[in-house]
């Protein structure tokens, strides 16, 4: 048996009682921190609360050598822990499919997800979100050219044209660290400067930091202003809204400090 258990958003206490029960009954417990990380805890605190030894898996362990440890689930109870909800990442869906191919039964214990948290924190309506996207850190190519991905810009543009909000995840890089809202705004404006399509001009954005923690920060403002706003430590995420419903606009003003001018000319 392989149980996928979502840990929630921030620390070791976010796990559900069902998830905790699965861990207590497990023969082996694994966790991966590369698709998402709980900023409010560490492995030692998790093992202390869960009263179980936890083995950390690398990206290679999960994506390239999963069969090496999945085989344990053929004749014992194995728990695989992930930040957030357990099936939001395509990587975890693929892992479940590989387990199925090996004849291993799987169960899911869901956890709080950033996808729902950003709606609750900002007041934006969850059914109005389109395709999400990740802004990667720029890098220098082998030819010495700075490469900035245009994909986030295009995704946001397409969603806006369809009347849909965009959840923009920010890159986590072992060398460059956690991307901030400020860096993300700078990148979007840089691409705007190159393309000149006006997508990011006078565009409202919502920056969210440390969702699920005791002290989350939510700030809505125009991209140029949000670029200079300090939201504190990681993890950060951005939402680029499309045309707002009145209740959404009111929520952004009252809950996220958006400029009151966004309430004008909204039905």
UniProtKB/Swiss-Prot annotation:
Instruction: Please give one Gene Ontology molecular function term for this protein.
Output: diphthine synthase activity
What's a Pfam family this protein contains?
TP_methylase
Q: Locate the residues binding S-adenosyl-L-methionine.
A: 9, 85, 88, 113-114, 170, 211, 236
Q: What are the record keywords, sorted?
A: Methyltransferase, S-adenosyl-L-methionine, Transferase
The catalytic activity, as recorded, is: 2-[(3S)-amino-3-carboxypropyl]-L-histidyl-[translation elongation factor 2] + 3 S-adenosyl-L-methionine = diphthine-[translation elongation factor 2] + 3 S-adenosyl-L-homocysteine + 3 H(+)
The biological pathway it contributes to is: Protein modification; peptidyl-diphthamide biosynthesis
Query: InterPro entries this protein is in?
Result: 4pyrrol_Mease, 4pyrrol_Methylase_sf, 4pyrrole_Mease_sub1, 4pyrrole_Mease_sub2, Dphthn_synthase
Domain of life per record: Archaea
E.C. number, please?
Answer: 2.1.1.98
- CDD domains for this protein: DHP5_DphB
- Is Acetylation there in the keyword field? no
Could you give a single Gene Ontology term from the biological process aspect?
Answer: methylation
Say which family it is in: Belongs to the diphthine synthase family.
Q: How does it assemble?
A: Homodimer.
| Function as written in the Swiss-Prot or TrEMBL entry | S-adenosyl-L-methionine-dependent methyltransferase that catalyzes the trimethylation of the amino group of the modified target histidine residue in translation elongation factor 2 (EF-2), to form an intermediate called diphthine. The three successive methylation reactions represent the second step of diphthamide biosynthesis.
State the protein's name: Diphthine synthase
Whose protein is this, by species? Answer: Methanococcoides burtonii (strain DSM 6242 / NBRC 107633 / OCM 468 / ACE-M)
């Amino acid at each position: 048996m392989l149980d996928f258990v979502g840990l929630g958003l921030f620390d070791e206490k976010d796990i559900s009682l069902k998830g905790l029960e699965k861990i207590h009954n497990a023969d082996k417990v694994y966790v991966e921190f590369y698709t998402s990380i709980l900023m409010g805890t560490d492995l030692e605190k998790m093992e202390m609360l869960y009263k179980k030894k936890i083995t950390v898996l690398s990206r290679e362990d999960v994506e390239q050598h999963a069969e090496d440890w999945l085989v344990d689930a053929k004749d014992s109870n194995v728990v695989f822990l992930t930040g957030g909800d357990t099936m939001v990442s395509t990587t975890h869906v693929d892992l479940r499919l590989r387990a199925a191919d090996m004849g291993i039964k799987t169960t899911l214990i869901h956890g709080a997800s950033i996808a729902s948290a950003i709606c609750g924190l900002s007041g934006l309506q969850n059914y109005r979100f389109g395709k999400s996207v990740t802004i990667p850190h720029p890098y220098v190519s082998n030819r010495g050219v700075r490469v900035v991905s245009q994909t986030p810009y295009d995704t946001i543009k397409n969603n806006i044209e369809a009347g849909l909000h965009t959840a923009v995840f920010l890159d986590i890089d072992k060398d460059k660290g956690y991307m901030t809202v400020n860096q993300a705004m700078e990148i979007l404006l840089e691409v705007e400067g190159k393309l000149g399509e006006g997508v990011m001009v006078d565009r409202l954005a919502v920056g969210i930091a440390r969702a699920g923690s005791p002290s989350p920060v939510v700030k809505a403002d125009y991209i140029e202003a949000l670029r200079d706003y300090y939201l504190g430590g990681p993890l950060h995420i951005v939402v680029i809204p499309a045309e707002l419903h009145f209740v959404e606009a009111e929520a952004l003003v009252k809950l996220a400090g958006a400029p009151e001018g966004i309430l004008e000319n909204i039905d």
